[in-house]
């Protein structure tokens, strides 16, 4: 079985392709077959990826050079077991397109906090790693509203007139915004930190299911 992850941002040229690249690389050696894809609710199909965010942190251009922007579709959302949106507007676009996705659609930063919390508590045991991952996603959804999310932060706009803008704690901001963008360095730092957390949690769940080392009695039963 495969576990499918869809990453989403507005144009599918900067944030979601970078999240896709990092997750794909981190999960490449997993015994479970992860399929990671990306799309954008306002994407211009075929557009090349922005490599600035990757260059800031030493990711080679080759990892993004083959990327071409893809418009978010109902089929892509329906196929995904987990949707990771860059920010709340992109997450809202996913749910508008496919309302039944609300329980498996999160922002990246929201998902990282919920997943880390879920994996640190008593969780279900499953023989099949994909079942364990699906149960994790369900648990993450159940935890909404019960776990403290990151607070909003203020970041400097990297052009005149110099000022600071507030970024919601659930969002990875868009460095390509026409008004009040933040720097690519801020964006890449947030993506790397939270994608790393997600990859670590997903790998832990797979490993626990594969070798039977997961917590004992399940408090959530899949399906």
Model regions and ranges:
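Conserved active-site segments centered on acidic
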Residues: 1-82, 88-92, 96, 100-101, ...
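Acidic side chains
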Residues: 81, 87, 170-174
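Short secondary-structure boundary segments
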Residues: 87-88, 109
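Phosphate-binding/catalytic loops
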Residues: 95-223
